A protein has these predicted regions:
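Conserved short strand/loop->alpha-helix "switch" segment adjacent to the catalytic nucleotide/phosphoryl-transfer site
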Residues: 25-49
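Short coil/turn residues that cap or connect secondary-structure elements
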Residues: 16, 32, 36-39, 59, ...
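Conserved beta-strand-loop-beta-strand hairpin that lines the nucleotide-binding pocket
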Residues: 1-11, 56-135
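STAS-typified acidic loop motif
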Residues: 11-21
Length: 135
């Protein structure tokens, strides 16, 4: 995950339940989407919703029973990370295919985010980056 100490960050704990995607959408809509164009803001909200939905459906929670949502912004970009208690698979083990439903979220992330990656520092996490530009 790309982390810069000099930019504003916020961390949220989401329930490991069907409520989590909606809460994540509301948080991102309020905190980050206004910084992006309408289309890119909508894309970011949808990507985060997909990642949180996958976390609820396919991974166990963090030790405290939640899913982590980390928001970070700078003058150039916004970054969102979703963490859970899932297995620590490397990206090659999570290869995606646009026709494979269970990996479709990664296909969307790869298609719409400006950057993304995995965190393997004690908790499983995926981060996405969207540049603050109109295109």
């Amino acid at each position: 995950m790309v982390v810069r100490d000099t930019v504003p960050t916020k961390d949220f704990s989401l329930p490991h339940s069907s409520e989590a995607p909606e809460r994540a959408r509301r948080i991102v809509e309020e905190q980050l989407a206004p910084l992006l164009s309408r289309v890119r803001g909508h894309d970011l909200v949808q990507l985060v919703s997909e990642l949180v939905s996958n976390s609820v459906q396919f991974s166990p929670p963090l030790p405290d029973g939640t899913i982590g949502l980390h928001l970070q912004r700078s003058d150039e970009e916004v970054i969102v990370a979703v963490t859970d208690g899932g297995t620590h698979l490397v990206p090659d083990e999570l290869a995606f295919d646009s026709h494979e439903h269970e990996r479709f979220g990664l296909f969307l992330v790869d298609s719409f985010a400006d950057g993304w990656g995995f965190s393997l520092d004690g908790v499983k996490g995926i981060w996405i980056e969207m540049e603050l530009r109109d295109a």
